[in-house]
Amino acid sequence: MANKTVLFNKHLESNAKMVDFHGWDMPLNYGSQIEEHHAVRQDAGMFDVSHMTVVDVTGTDACAFLRKLLANDVAKLKVPGKALYGGMLDDNAGIIDDLITYYLTDTFYRVVVNSATREKDLAWIAKQSQGFDVTVTERPELAMIAVQGPNAKAKAAAVFSSEQNAAIEGMKPFFGKQAGSLFIATTGYTGEAGYEIIVPETEAEALWQALLDQGVKPCGLGARDTLRLEAGMNLYGLDMDETINPLAANMGWTIAWEPTDRDFIGRKALEALRDAGTDKLVGLVMEEKGVLRHDMPVFFTDAAGVEQQGVITSGTFSPTLGYSIAMARVPSSIGDTAEVEMRKKRVAVRVVAPNFVRNGKQAF
């Protein structure tokens, strides 16, 4: 029996095509994935992300616990509401999950983890919390709606109360604030401005309808995937998992190496990998016909004249750019060009930073 979010009936009202997503009945699209994608790049779209898992970590050791649990350092968060992104690693520096952590008070942090990894994440967090004075509380009574796009904030403002708008006025990117019954965060998975709104399940349908009434277009998993790939954002299970370390997943920037005495889980293994050198995640662009896809092999000749091989982790046609893009894990000796094997022939591709579109425009 698949799980259903509290917005399931709203999706059916908008003629969503529903699919199974890691045990959840979720909308793939509402008729046109391309139109939904363009709505987010050009206007405003919204996603039901209530399948994501909200976990509150409270207690006198909350900071110390999260400094051990995460490769990024929550001690950097000094202003209430500030958030950071990073990996939760195992002892071998494999990525158990990537997640966002909000600092609310010295004894209260909110962590948002992926739905596909929920059970193993909760088990790992519970296991590692032993010996710390913390309480770990899953919040299944909370739903979440992401509103994204150049007009998303303005359209959301028409739905928020005057008190809520006052509370979030001038809020910088990667912040979250409790405003009335809503937890409103300037985060997202699209490369556009907007909000991720954590809302009590009892109020979620009304919020979704109010946003719909403001002309915010419902968007499904299809558009969510093409948008995040254009933005160069990893998808857990495709671009990284427990067999991949953050240095090989374009997540090196999320590792807080300083202070050197912070012994986060996976640190020793990660230091050894850093010193030895790892593969890296790059962007690929193919302007001729065809679509780059997950698992296609990537070839290039290094400076020493030796053929090297990597693999595409995520690939798609980019609706914004009009040609195919991909992320690929390759040896770090790669240059500016490579070849991808598709339909039993090799096709030339450009190698770029894994960040293709930001705020509606080409980013490379």
Curated annotation (Swiss-Prot):
InterPro entries: GCS_T, GCS_T_bac, GCST_C, GCV_T_N, GcvT/YgfZ/DmdA, GcvT/YgfZ_C, TrmE/GcvT_dom1. Its EC number is 2.1.2.10. One of its GO terms (biological process) is glycine decarboxylation via glycine cleavage system. One of its GO terms (cellular component) is cytosol. One of its GO terms (molecular function) is aminomethyltransferase activity. Pfam families: GCV_T, GCV_T_C. It is an enzyme of class 2 (transferase). It catalyses: N(6)-[(R)-S(8)-aminomethyldihydrolipoyl]-L-lysyl-[protein] + (6S)-5,6,7,8-tetrahydrofolate = N(6)-[(R)-dihydrolipoyl]-L-lysyl-[protein] + (6R)-5,10-methylene-5,6,7,8-tetrahydrofolate + NH4(+). Keywords: Aminotransferase, Transferase. Belongs to the GcvT family. HAMAP family: GcvT. This is Aminomethyltransferase.
